[in-house]
Amino acid sequence: MKKLCINISLFFMLLTLSSCNDWLDEVKQTTTVSDEIIWQDETQVDKYVNSFYPLLHDYGQFGEAQFYGSFTESLTDAFKYGSYTLGHRAGHPNLYVLTPDAISPDNCLYSIWLRSTAYKQIRETNQFLSLQRKYSEFSADRNKLWEAQVRFFRAFVYFQLAKRHGGVILYDDLPVSTNKARSSAEETWQFIADDLDFAANNLPKEWDAANKGRITKGAAYALKSRAMLYAKRWQDAYDAANNVIALKLYGLTDKYEDAWKGN
């Protein structure tokens, strides 16, 4: 009898362990996320795309990647100290005026190469696009919407490089070599134009309320218009600006002060 009870107990123990294994097989791993797992969940991909949006601040007027977050007017005769320069950079504009030797070949503050910032971001956009091609099984329209946003940001970073250096090294995929030749200025501007054309063709004019603030068709056209001015491609700049106007979503503010309200 005792032996029978032991056998029955062992049977139910094994049955329980088997059920546990089945349950564990169904649990998604969330503490460490693989590339493949991200591309199985639309929400996770949206978050992946969101990781590129801080670039708008980083390379904006007050961003750390743009002249250390300080005013570039301090390099000109038009300098006037502003009311807002980020945190510990607050005194930098005055520093540049009073001690111009603070800027040297070894301490070039007007640079976006610090910590390999620009090409690090370009590599991350290319990594997103590479993983998308490899793993995404979402609809073509959904994929284009993600790709359009990421290619906008790739163009945005290349624009920061091109307006300073002209031709730069172009990567449209993950690099296989660190010795790639520098492209011409014309090739660089065309690369930027192509990315922005794709973005403009695949982004919506407006997003729903839940996605307000995302890159739009108008933003892609506007950036292309500005980039083509630097490239001296006047007709392309004109056409892109007209495309923004044709959307009938934007206009000049009645009062200059309203331009700073961020609405």
Q: In which residue ranges do the predicted regions lie?
A:
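Conserved, well-structured interaction surfaces
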Residues: E42-D46, N50, P54-G60, T85-H165, ...
